[in-house]
C-alpha cells in the first residue's frame, strides 16, 4: 500500500502463483461494487491492486479478504512478496510438470515468517515449469526451475533491477517435496549476509558482490545443511488428495498434439470460426447482460487463434485476455466471473506480463 495523500491509497491483494479461484474472483467483484472501486491493476508479480481507496475501504478490504483466502499483509515493504509461477502451470502443453502446488506451499511458508523475521529488503521467489521461464526464475532472489525428469534446479541472489544479476545456481536436481528447505536456507542466508545499512544495496543480488559468486554459493549451501540438520523430515511437502494425484499425473505428460483425433491447430481454427460467427456489430455476447468486447473498448487487432490456448488436457482450452498496461476495466471482473462461475474447475490465472 502506498499513499501520496488523502484518498490516494492502493491495496494489493496477494494471489500466490497468480491463481484467482472463482471464490477469490467473486470477492474482488463484490469489493469493487461495495467500495465503488474505479481503478484496478494486475501486476507483473501476479497480484491484483485496487487504486484510489479511502482509509475505511482499505481497512475493510484487508479484514474481509481473509475470509476469502486472500492475504494483503506484506504486499509491499521488506517482506516476502507474492510467489510467482508460470501462469498456466498444470494445464500448459509441453511443461515439465505442475509446479503450482509446490509454489503455493512455499508462499504459505513465507507468510508464516512475516511476523518473526526482519529481512534486509523484499524477497521475491519464482517457479518456472518449462524452458520458457516466463517468471524469470533464474533472475529472482530465489528461483526454482523445473527439469524434464521432475526435479528443480535452484537459483539464488538474482535480480532484474539496478545492477541486475543472474542468480547463482546453488543446487541441482532438487526433489519438489524438498523446496521448503531451500526457502528457509534463503531466508537465513539473506538475514545473515544481507545489507541492513544501505537500502541501495540491500537486495539479495548484492551478496554476490560482497561474498563473490563462489563465496555466496558456499554460504547458501552451509545454511542449507544447517536447515536440513535442524528440521530433518519436518519440512517435506506432502501433497494430498486431488492435488497430489494431479501433480503426479502431470509429470512428463507433455504430449497433447492431438485432441480427440483433431490437430490442435485445426481445433483453434474451428473455435476462431465459431467465435467469428457469433460476432454482430463488433460485439461478442455471452448472454443478454454481458458484453465481452467491442472494437471501442478493446482496440487491439489480435487474432482469436493467438488468444485461445489448447491445454494438455484433451478438449480443454484457456483464453488469454491482455489489458493494456495491466489496467483492467473494473466491470471486466464481473463479466469474467459471470462467464466462469458455472464452469467446473475454471479459474483465472494472472501472468507476469499482466495478461
Provide a role label for each language-model segment.
Residues 119-213, 217:
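Mobile "lid/hinge" segments at catalytic clefts and subdomain interfaces of large enzymes
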Residues 111-115, 187, 191-195, 225-228, ...:
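Hydrophobic/aromatic-lined pockets within catalytic cores
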Residues 11-152, 181, 250-258, 262-269, ...:
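Small-residue-enriched alpha-helical segments and adjacent helix-cap loops
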Amino acid at each position: 500500500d502506498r499513499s501520496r495523500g488523502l484518498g490516494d491509497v492502493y491495496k494489493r491483494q496477494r494471489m500466490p502463483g497468480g491463481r484467482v479461484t472463482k471464490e477469490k474472483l467473486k470477492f474482488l467483484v463484490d469489493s469493487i461494487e461495495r467500495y465503488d472501486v474505479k481503478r484496478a491493476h494486475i501486476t507483473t508479480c501476479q497480484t491484483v491492486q485496487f487504486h484510489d481507496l479511502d482509509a475505511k475501504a482499505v481497512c475493510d478490504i484487508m479484514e474481509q479478504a481473509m475470509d476469502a483466502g486472500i492475504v494483503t499483509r506484506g504486499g509491499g515493504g521488506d517482506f516476502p512478496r507474492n510467489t510467482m509461477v508460470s501462469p498456466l502451470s498444470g494445464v500448459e502443453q509441453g511443461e515439465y510438470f505442475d509446479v503450482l502446488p509446490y509454489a503455493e506451499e512455499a508462499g504459505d511458508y513465507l507468510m508464516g515468517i512475516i511476523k518473526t523475521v526482519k529481512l534486509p529488503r523484499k524477497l521475491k521467489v519464482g517457479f518456472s515449469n518449462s524452458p520458457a521461464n516466463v517468471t524469470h526464475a533464474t533472475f529472482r532472489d530465489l528461483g526454482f526451475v523445473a527439469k524434464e525428469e521432475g526435479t528443480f534446479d535452484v537459483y539464488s541472489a538474482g535480480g532484474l533491477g539496478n545492477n541486475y544479476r543472474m542468480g547463482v545456481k546453488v543446487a541441482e536436481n532438487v526433489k519438489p517435496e524438498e523446496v521448503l528447505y531451500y526457502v528457509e536456507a534463503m531466508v537465513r542466508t539473506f538475514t545473515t549476509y544481507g545489507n541492513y545499512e544501505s537500502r541501495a544495496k540491500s537486495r539479495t543480488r548484492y551478496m554476490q558482490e560482497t561474498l563473490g559468486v563462489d563465496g555466496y554459493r558456499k554460504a547458501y549451501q552451509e545454511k542449507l545443511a544447517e536447515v536440513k540438520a535442524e528440521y530433518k523430515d519436518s519440512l517435506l511437502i506432502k501433497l494430498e488428495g486431488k492435488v497430489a494425484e494431479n501433480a503426479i499425473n502431470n509429470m512428463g505428460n507433455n504430449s497433447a498434439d492431438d485432441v480427440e483425433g483433431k490437430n490442435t491447430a485445426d481445433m483453434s481454427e474451428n473455435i476462431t470460426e465459431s467465435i467469428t460467427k457469433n460476432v454482430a456489430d463488433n460485439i461478442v455476447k455471452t448472454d443478454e447482460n454481458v458484453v465481452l468486447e467491442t472494437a471501442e473498448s478493446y482496440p487491439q487487432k489480435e487474432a482469436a487463434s493467438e488468444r485461445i490456448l489448447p491445454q494438455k488436457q484433451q478438449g480443454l482450452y484457456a483464453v488469454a485476455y491482455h489489458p493494456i498496461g495491466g489496467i483492467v476495466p473494473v466491470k471486466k471482473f464481473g463479466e469474467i466471473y459471470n462467464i466462469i462461475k458455472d464452469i467446473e474447475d475454471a479459474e483465472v490465472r494472472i501472468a507476469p506480463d499482466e495478461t
